[in-house]
C-alpha cells in the first residue's frame, strides 16, 4: 500500500473526507452536509474504553501508570529501568517490576522520538531543537546539543555513539559521553523521524524526501542513496 494521510476539511456547511498519498494530489472520497441532526436519538452509547477483550483472553495488568500527556515513543530498557518520553516534554524512568517512577527530566517541548541508553546515559531528542544526554540513574542532565530544528527522530546508540536525525534535515553522530558532535550529514531534503539502522559500517535511514540513505558510520560521508 501507499503511505499517506486522512484529511478532514470542515467548512460552515459540510465535512469533506480526503486521502493525501505522499507525492500525489489530494483525493476527496466522501462529503457530509452539516445540516439537521447527524445522530440517532434512540442509539445506545458505546462504553469507552472497552475492556471486554481482557476477559476473553485472561489478560491481567501487572501495573499501570497514568502519565501527564500522550506517549508517542516506544520505551527503552536498561537493567531494571525503562525510559519513555511524552507529549509534555518529560522523560520518565520507571522500575520495570512495579511501575514505580524513579525520576523525571523535563525538556522544553514534546518528546516524540524513541530514546536509547548505553553505559548509564539516556539520549533523546525534543521538539525544542535539542538532543539531550541524561544520567540513567537519576535523570540529571549530562550534556545537551542544540540543533536548527525540532528533533523528532529516534536514537540508535552503538559503541558509545548516538545516531539521530532531526527536522533540520540532518543526520548526526554524537559522542554519548561528551555530547560533542562527531559528524553531521546535511544532504537530506526532508524530515528524519525514523530510528537509523547501523550495520556493516553504515548508517541507513529514510526521510520524508522519499529517499533511503546509507552513510559511512565513521565519518558521515554518503555511500549511496
Go through each PLM region and give its residues.
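Binuclear metal-dependent phosphoesterase catalytic core
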Residues: 1-46
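Extracytoplasmic/lumenal domain signature
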Residues: 39-71, 76-152, 156-193, 197-225
Amino acid at each position: 500500500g501507499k503511505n499517506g494521510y486522512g484529511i478532514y476539511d470542515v467548512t460552515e456547511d459540510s465535512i469533506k473526507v480526503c486521502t493525501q498519498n505522499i507525492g500525489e494530489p489530494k483525493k476527496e472520497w466522501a462529503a457530509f452536509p452539516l445540516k439537521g441532526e447527524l445522530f440517532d436519538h434512540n442509539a445506545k452509547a458505546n462504553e469507552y474504553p472497552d475492556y471486554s477483550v481482557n476477559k476473553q483472553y485472561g489478560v491481567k495488568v501487572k501495573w499501570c501508570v497514568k502519565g501527564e500527556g500522550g506517549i508517542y515513543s516506544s520505551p527503552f530498557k536498561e537493567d531494571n529501568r525503562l525510559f519513555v518520553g511524552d507529549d509534555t516534554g518529560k522523560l520518565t524512568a520507571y522500575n520495570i517490576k512495579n511501575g514505580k517512577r524513579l525520576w523525571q527530566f523535563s525538556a522544553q517541548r514534546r518528546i516524540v522520538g524513541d530514546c536509547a541508553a548505553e553505559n548509564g546515559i539516556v539520549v533523546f531528542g525534543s521538539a525544542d531543537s535539542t538532543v539531550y544526554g541524561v544520567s540513567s540513574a537519576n535523570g540529571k542532565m549530562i550534556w545537551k546539543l542544540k540543533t536548527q530544528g525540532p528533533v523528532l527522530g529516534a536514537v540508535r546508540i552503538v559503541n558509545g555513539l548516538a545516531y539521530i536525525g532531526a527536522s533540520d534535515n540532518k543526520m548526526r553522530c554524537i559522542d554519548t559521553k561528551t555530547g560533542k558532535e562527531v559528524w553531521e550529514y546535511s544532504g537530506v531534503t526532508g524530515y528524519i523521524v525514523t530510528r537509523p539502522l547501523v550495520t556493516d559500517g553504515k548508517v541507513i535511514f529514510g526521510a520524508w524526501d522519499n529517499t533511503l540513505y546509507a552513510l559511512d558510520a565513521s565519518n558521515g560521508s554518503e555511500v549511496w542513496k
